[in-house]
Amino acid sequence: MSSKNQKADPLIQINNLKIEGFSDEQWHPIIKGVNLTLKRGQVMGLIGESGAGKSTLGLAAMGYTQPGCRITGGEILFEGDDLASLRDSEKQKFWGNRMTYVAQSAAASFNPAHRLIDQTTASAIRFKIKNETDAKKDAQRLYEALNLPNPESIGDRYPHQVSGGQLQRVMTAMAMSPRPDLIVFDEPTTALDVTTQVEVLTAMKNIVEEFNTAAIYITHDLAVVAQMADVIKVLRYGN
């Protein structure tokens, strides 16, 4: 199959997905029959108010359900495999490898006792995508592509030794290191000031385009999603 056709084919196909959450001693609908299609190299903006179910849906695209949630109907097709029907042990081969996640709080995602370079390369080495030497060279290239200062040495620092905007970009490098097919950005710039937010968004957009990675960008900010996304979906009351 040609690369052109591969890009045209859906990477993720979500069909009539229904998810419930448990609260007040009963199950409540969160996602109510959502349909989505995401192609390789495409950035989908997922926008909605707080509590609309954006993060639940974004994680579900990776086949992951948060504690207290359950899938009650529909399909999550990843290159034809229905993630909704797989056991967690079967989905482990995708998580942190072919699918990665960038959270809102970079600081909470890093181990303060480990150098940035070691955390950036961990998945690529663990899944045997690259050896340690090649993974570190690639991490430096990612740092440079993300406009981090001193890309050849910033990885020797610890999380507390860089700014919030820099740490957010290192987390993007960590997510890109295994060259995933899908990356989910969950409001990763919310805690940053406006100037830093623009810098980080630009760097994220450029690197996703460079590696032809499909992405879901979750936010409540229309201006942010307009800068990142090729297509925008609005989630409201689970629809």
Spans of features found by a protein language model:
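The feature captures the beta-strand-to-loop junction immediately N-terminal to the Walker
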Residues: I47-E49
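A short, proline-enriched helix->beta-strand linker immediately N-terminal to the Walker B motif
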Residues: S177-D181
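Conserved ABC transporter NBD signature motif
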Residues: R70-D82
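Helical segment within the ABC ATPase nucleotide-binding domain
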Residues: V198-F211
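Short, glycine/charged-rich "phosphate-handling" switch motifs in NTP-dependent
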Residues: V231
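A short, surface-exposed alpha-helical micro-motif characterized by mixed small hydrophobic
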Residues: V225-Q227
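Catalytic Walker B motif of ABC-type/P-loop ATPase nucleotide-binding domains
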Residues: I183-D186
